[in-house]
Amino acid sequence: MKSAGCGKMRTLQDGAGTVLSGGKSRKYTLRVPDDYDNNHPYRLILSFHGATGDSSQVAPSYFGLWSLSEGSTIFIAPDAVGGFWSADDDVTFVDDILEQVTDDLCIDTSRIALEGFSQGGAMAWTLACARPNVYRAAVVHSGGGLARPASCQPVAFMSSLGQQESGGAGQTSNSDFFAGQNGCTVESLAKAPRGGHACSDYEGCSAGHPTRWCDYDGGHTPSPNDAGQNMSWMPQEVWAFLSQF
């Protein structure tokens, strides 16, 4: 579905942006394809940094998805106040970003997705639960720090956690939670081999709500490498998941 910004001359430019939210000027970083066409509705991915961080930890690579998207996607990295996300104020903040951006840029409002790391991952699942009719999918890397709302509804969901993290070693509570919401069969999933990774799809999920889990032998990071490899395997896994929508 085309947003109100389709057909308009854009005023928002790449780089730092601001929006008034809750009476405060809030910041985010925007990246639009170089050959942007104001009549073409783009996928939008919102990328959330971890605790104590800011959008510079995410932009300009957006967890490695920018290069993989090949001009198909607009990316936004919001900034948390003081580096920490709030389940209340920041849901409204992201609402306000979306209102501003969809009014100015040509967005496919049926293909808005979330990705976040650590507390930013928790912010992604909070938004997926709070606004299930807005977000098509959510990807959570090592998410923690915010409570899951009780009002969660089905949403396509992917998560990952390292075996060497606190609460790791096969801890699938995030993915199991959303698997339950999505009507999937909660089952024993593949474990990563030493120095490697293993990704698994839950079975029996409701139509349009695939649920995927990635286990890896590593620590607290959104971009783990397999042993002996210089490049992370995670961006390709995430892009394969999100680009199906």
Task: Name every feature range the model reports, one short phrase each.
Residues 164-168, 220-222:
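Acidic catalytic loop of the alpha/beta-hydrolase fold
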Residues 56-67, 96-97, 141-150, 193-203:
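Alpha-helical scaffolding within the catalytic cores
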Residues 5-7, 15-113, 126, 130, ...:
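Serine-hydrolase catalytic machinery in alpha/beta-hydrolase-like enzymes
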Residues 75-77, 210-215:
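Conserved beta-strand scaffold positions in the cores of enzyme catalytic domains, especially
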Residues 82, 193-199, 213, 217-222:
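Histidine-bearing beta->alpha loop at or near hydrolase active sites
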Residues 158-161:
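Short beta-strand/loop motif that positions the catalytic acidic residue
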Residues 1-44, 88-89, 115-139, 143-145, ...:
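A domain-start/cap signature at the N-terminus of enzymes
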